[in-house]
């Protein structure tokens, strides 16, 4: 066999194997970020947020970006009065989403935490909607507390973030939210309702300390993981895994004064 034919044979084998490997990963890796399948349909979407009086200095500014995005994209927006459920405020998003779903006025509900704001108003969230998916959110690589045995290395794990949630108004999601609400063991957890969702979806590694217990379950069949553009947490690192010009910036984990300072510097209206 000539060298030319041998090279072509090797190239063909590699291309075939590479294609098989990629397909295998797509079919078996529930953490794959879905490709953007652009939808031409315009859905009835309601953007919602809620915060208490102690968060006014942040929420009163960020909500204006939600309102502006809704106006540009042709959606509805409401800043809902924080209900008195007796739980930490972060939990109330679950109660609010359930109450809004029961009304059946909108096809999709988009929750955004009050410590997040739109940075780019021109990209339609409806472009992310896929017929078989009902829950849309972002996941981030986060450093875990257990140290690595290797020098100059850190262990990271994928953690879901519920600061931005797009949910289809469906019976599946209403039942899911009720199960989240019923996870009372997480009422006072540092991640509140997010910890309950992590438990329900079998992302338990950061809840029980077992780093292998993060594989997910059948709930992921209805979940689409969006790119970090939709929920980008600022980093102090020069090289960040987050996007340089994201759609939504989420000031998760920041102190209140730092949030105000960041918003005054970065928020675009």
Language model segments and positions:
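Conserved donor-nucleotide/metal-binding helix-loop-beta segment in metal-dependent transferases, i.e.
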Residues: 118-157
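Short beta-strand-to-loop acidic/aromatic patch adjacent to the donor-nucleotide binding site
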Residues: 106-115
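Short acidic donor-binding/metal-coordinating loop in glycosyltransferase active sites
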Residues: 82, 114-116, 121
């Amino acid at each position: 066999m000539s060298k030319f034919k041998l090279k072509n044979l090797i190239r063909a084998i590699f291309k075939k194997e590479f294609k098989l490997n990629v397909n295998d990963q797509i079919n078996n890796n529930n953490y794959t970020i879905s490709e953007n399948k652009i939808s031409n349909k315009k859905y009835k979407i309601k953007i919602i947020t809620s915060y208490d009086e102690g968060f006014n200095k942040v929420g009163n500014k960020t909500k204006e970006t939600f309102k502006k995005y809704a106006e540009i994209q042709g959606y509805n927006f409401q800043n809902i009065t924080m209900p008195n459920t007796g739980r930490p405020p972060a939990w109330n998003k679950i109660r609010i989403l359930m109450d809004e779903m029961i009304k059946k006025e909108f096809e999709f509900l988009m929750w955004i935490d009050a410590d997040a704001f739109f940075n780019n108003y021109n990209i339609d969230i409806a472009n992310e909607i896929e017929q078989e998916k009902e829950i849309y959110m972002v996941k981030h690589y986060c450093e875990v507390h257990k140290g690595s045995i290797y020098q100059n290395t850190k262990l990271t794990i994928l953690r879901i973030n519920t600061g931005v949630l797009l949910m289809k108004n469906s019976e599946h999601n209403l039942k899911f939210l009720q199960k989240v609400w019923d996870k009372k063991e997480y009422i006072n957890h540092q991640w509140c309702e997010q910890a309950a969702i992590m438990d329900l979806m079998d992302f338990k590694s950061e809840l029980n300390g077992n780093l292998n217990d993060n594989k997910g379950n059948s709930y992921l069949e209805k979940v689409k993981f969006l790119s970090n553009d939709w929920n980008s947490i600022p980093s102090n690192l020069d090289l960040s895994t987050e996007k340089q010009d994201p759609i939504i910036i989420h000031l998760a984990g920041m102190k209140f004064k730092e949030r105000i300072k960041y918003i005054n510097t970065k928020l675009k209206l």
